[in-house]
Curated annotation (Swiss-Prot):
Pathway: Secondary metabolite biosynthesis; flavonoid biosynthesis. The gene is CHS. This is Chalcone synthase. Belongs to the thiolase-like superfamily. Chalcone/stilbene synthases family. It catalyses: (E)-4-coumaroyl-CoA + 3 malonyl-CoA + 3 H(+) = 2',4,4',6'-tetrahydroxychalcone + 3 CO2 + 4 CoA. It holds the Pfam family Chal_sti_synt_N. The active site is at residue 164. Its EC number is 2.3.1.74. Signal peptide: none annotated. The keyword Metal-binding does not apply. The primary product of this enzyme is 4,2',4',6'-tetrahydroxychalcone (also termed naringenin-chalcone or chalcone) which can under specific conditions spontaneously isomerize into naringenin.
Amino acid sequence: MVTVEEVRRAQRAEGPATVLAIGTATPANCVDQSTYPDYYFRITNSEHMTELKEKFKRMCDKSNIKRRYMHLTEEILKENPAMCEYMAPSLDARQDIVVVEVPRLGKEAAQKAIKEWGQPKSKITHLVFCTTSGVDMPGADYQLTKLLGLRPSVKRFMMYQQGCFAGGTVLRMAKDLAENNAGARVLVVCSEITAVTFRGPADTHLDSLVGQALFGDGAAAVIVGSDPVVGVERPLFQIVTAAQTLLPDSHGAIDGHLREVGLTFHLLKDVPGLISKNIEKSLKEAFDPLGISDWNSVFWIAHPGGPAILDQVEEKLGLKPEKLRSTRQVLSEYGNMSSACVLFILDEMRKSSAKEGMSTTGEGLDWGVLFGFGPGLTVETVVLHSVPLN
């Protein structure tokens, strides 16, 4: 007769959770940031709000974003005029879009990750799906399982309404699943569509306007597993530790509420200050056990909430400009895609490291940090170890 302890030991993997593949996807519709203010005020019938339009132009100019991708085209918005008003009942129309498009875009990213992984999708044992775009039952995890043709026995977990920190959350969860289930291969998908938050401008709520200047659509997928099969699976990053914390005195700094008018977004001005003031504590807790205290000696993947957050973090920690290069590159090319952002940055970093002939997937460095920031304020801190590049 076997003991519970023997069963438990047999269930555990030996090595650390490892990112084995990454895939990303965006809608076809690309929006140029320089012309977006004119388009946005025209499509929302707000061109008479000239002062507010000038403010919005300045927001877009300061965003450090060149382009974004959005499922919402002019044609779709003209068919759904309530979505173009500031506070018109429009949840049904938004839901009709996101319940279809969130899994569909997630499928596109997942297929790319599965192709890079090079293994049959029947080997996927777990699915973690995350979106802040709408809710449904059965969820986007179920829809994706059907779209991809995954096994009916795949163990699914659906995360709705988490916000921008959740790219770190899904890696933390994937780490626990992979390391506690020998042979597990976890498909992680973050898929975000701004159809749930798009709305016209209002001079009484500039925080909503900030969201309209920053947010874009995108989906990213990673496959995570422990003990990679040598010669068959190619490791990209090891997930070493993962932690979550609530920042002190930050209640109400970022929040969102699902209403008849869609998902409303609220942001306090001191968010960059709250994050930069507290970030070193999270870093020390993560890296003290490793004997690392030089923040320029690690590679950086930070959720790019907006340029002000990145600038203040950089200044507070004395980071060299190149430390946030991959982060700023993704912000520039895609905007803020909520939970998907950090996975896009992970992809950008491993690709640029290989392209530039660096010795590891982490810009030639061994250790790195992935940060997610979002409603709460919640901070996810994930310590990564890079993999040598041949």
